[in-house]
Each structure stands twice: as structure tokens, then as C-alpha cells.
């Protein structure tokens, strides 16, 4: 169901929705809020303004028996985010506790898009039947516009407990944290050697984020994932003596072939000479010269 619209706010009042009864449900069910009228939104859009929620008040008034048990969970979602990341703030309180919930937005939104904020409730661990009209909700919104967005100081959600039998120990509320942001600068091997940094050249199919995570800095080498992808990228920082693989396989093979020869060339020549002489002496018959008488 879409959020209802109402007259635009001014600096001193809030847009109030009707105090309506809601049925008990174990699933997230939308609480209808009223926002500025379509005409007011178009007027702000034509003036190229953006909008934010300065303050949101959700009034909860229970109408269950005194022995009713269970917890009510109220959540604010920003539909600009994916479904598993849209939750911005949540409150959990006893089903019998009358309470006012306060929320302060920390971001602007464009009026060219649908109003992104949605308010939901659900009931858990209760002994009250489903579809019972267990409570009334009423929303109050104070919005503002600006020519452009600015940084908004963070204000945590708060509560105002109206039932005396309950205290802060019975209430829980939370707010989403700032999104994590990590950047790593690239340093090539040649530039990091001299402490220089050069521009990053992107090629087709590459992105700034992926390109700028490649480097040889010490911080980049700390990532286990990066080390698994590029296990040898930092070998250039080792000395040449460590990187020298030694003699090649061919040199080692030749050395092994020559390892059984322990004679010098002169010794080899002497062996050949003596062998030849021995063969001549053994195979040739010496003839005594005849004398002439």
C-alpha cells in the first residue's frame, strides 16, 4: 500500500496521519504515513530541491488485556537500498507499553523518485490472536527541502515511555551504521622504488576500484585474498642473490657427464702414447740385421 499524502509542512508544524487501528500480525505490515501532496512535491521538484525527514514520531497506543504478552517491532526502511540493506532503524518494546518512537533522518532524497521511506510493524512471541486489532498507530512527520544535500549530523533514535510499569530496560532500539568504505592506491614497482605516484590508465572492461587495488605496497600485500590471486607479485623486493636460481639444467647435465674424467689432457696424451708403443712392441718381430761376409 502506498503512503498517503497530505498538505505540505511549514517550519513549525508536522504532517500528522490518522490514528488508525492495526491488526496483529507476525509478518511485517506497513504503517501508513502522510507525506506532502503531489502538487507540493512537483513544486519542489521544479525548483530542483531535494527533501529530507527532519523528525518522525510514531505514537503507539495498545488495546490488549493486561495479561497479554509479546513484543512489538517497528522498523523504518529506505527503499532506495536493496531488500537486505533497507533497514534504517528499529524499535522493540512490550505489547502493553504505550510509547512514542522518535527518528531523525540522516540523508536527503530526490523528488524525482518515489518517497523512499516505509514504516512497518510486526508482533512476536505473543498470546494474542492474529488479526486482533491490538493497537493504534499515529505518525507525525516534519520535512524540509534544500537546493542541494549537505552533511547531516547524526542523531540516534529515541523513545518516550508513557506506561509507568515499563522502563528503559524493557525497550530496545537501534540504528544502521555508516557504510564501510575502503580505498587502496596503486603504486607500480618502478614508481614505488623512487616514492613517485603516476596516473592510473584504465583499459576497456576495467574499473577504477579493481585497477587501483593492484600494487606492490606493503599494505596491499596484507590481504590474504590478494596474496592468493597474485602469489608472486612482491618477489621483486627480494635481492638478486635470493632470486638467482643457479645453473641451468643443461649446465648441470654437462657437469655430471664430465664428473668421471679426472685426467688432464697431458696425462691422457701420455697414456695414448704409451699404449701405442706397447702395441707396436708386442706385435712387431724385431729382425736382426744380417752381416755380409
Swiss-Prot record:
Top-level taxonomic group: Viruses
Subunit structure: Binds to dimeric supercoiled plasmid DNA.
Post-translational modifications reported in the UniProt record: Phosphorylated.
Keywords in alphabetical order: DNA-binding, Host cell membrane, Host endoplasmic reticulum, Host membrane, Host microsome, Membrane, Phosphoprotein, Transport, Viral movement protein
Segments crossing the lipid bilayer: none
Membrane topology annotation: Peripheral membrane protein
Identification of the protein by name: Movement protein BC1
Pfam family, one: Gemini_BL1
Location relative to the cell: Host cell membrane; Host microsome membrane; Host endoplasmic reticulum membrane
Biological process terms in GO annotation: exit of virus from host cell nucleus through nuclear pore; transport of virus in host, cell to cell
UniProt similarity note: Belongs to the begomovirus movement protein BC1 family.
A GO cellular component annotation in the UniProt record: host cell plasma membrane
One GO MF term: DNA binding
Keyword Magnesium: no
Function: Transports viral genome to neighboring plant cells directly through plasmosdesmata, without any budding. The movement protein allows efficient cell to cell propagation, by bypassing the host cell wall barrier. Begomovirus genome is shuttled out of nucleus by Nuclear shuttle protein (NSP) and the movement protein transports the DNA-NSP complex to cell plasmodesmata and facilitates further movement across the cell wall.
Origin organism lineage: Viruses, Monodnaviria, Shotokuvirae, Cressdnaviricota, Repensiviricetes
Amino acid at each position: 500500500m502506498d503512503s498517503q499524502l497530505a498538505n505540505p509542512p511549514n517550519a513549525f508544524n508536522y504532517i500528522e496521519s490518522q490514528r488508525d487501528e492495526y491488526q496483529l500480525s507476525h509478518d511485517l505490515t506497513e504503517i501508513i504515513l502522510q507525506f506532502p501532496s503531489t502538487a507540493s512535491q512537483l513544486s519542489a521538484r521544479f525548483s530542483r530541491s531535494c527533501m529530507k525527514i527532519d523528525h518522525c514520531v510514531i505514537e503507539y497506543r495498545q488495546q490488549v488485556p493486561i495479561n497479554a504478552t509479546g513484543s512489538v517491532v517497528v522498523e523504518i526502511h529506505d527503499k532506495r537500498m536493496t531488500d537486505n540493506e533497507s533497514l534504517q532503524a528499529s524499535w522493540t518494546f512490550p505489547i502493553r507499553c504505550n510509547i512514542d518512537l522518535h527518528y531523525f533522518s540522516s540523508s536527503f532524497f530526490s523528488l524525482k523518485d518515489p518517497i523512499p521511506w516505509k514504516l512497518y510493524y510486526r508482533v512476536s512471541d505473543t498470546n494474542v490472536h492474529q488479526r486482533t486489532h491490538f493497537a493504534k498507530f499515529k505518525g507525525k512527520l516534519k520535512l524540509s527541502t534544500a537546493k542541494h544535500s549537505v552533511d547531516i549530523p547524526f542523531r540516534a533514535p529515541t523513545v518516550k515511555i508513557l506506561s509507568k510499569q515499563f522502563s528503559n530496560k524493557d525497550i530496545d532500539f537501534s540504528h544502521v551504521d555508516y557504510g564501510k568504505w575502503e580505498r587502496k592506491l596503486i603504486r607500480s614497482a618502478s614508481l614505488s622504488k623512487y616514492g613517485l605516484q603516476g596516473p592510473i590508465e584504465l583499459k576497456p572492461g576495467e574499473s577504477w576500484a579493481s585497477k587501483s587495488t593492484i600494487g606492490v605496497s606493503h599494505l596491499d600485500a596484507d590481504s590474504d585474498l590478494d596474496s592468493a590471486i597474485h602469489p608472486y607479485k612482491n618477489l621483486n623486493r627480494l635481492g638478486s642473490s635470493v632470486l638467482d636460481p643457479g645453473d641451468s639444467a643443461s649446465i648441470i647435465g654437462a657437469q655430471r657427464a664430465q664428473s668421471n674424467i679426472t685426467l688432464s689432457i697431458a696425462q691422457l696424451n701420455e697414456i695414448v702414447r704409451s699404449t701405442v708403443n706397447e702395441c707396436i712392441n708386442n706385435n712387431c718381430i724385431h729382425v736382426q740385421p744380417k752381416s755380409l761376409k
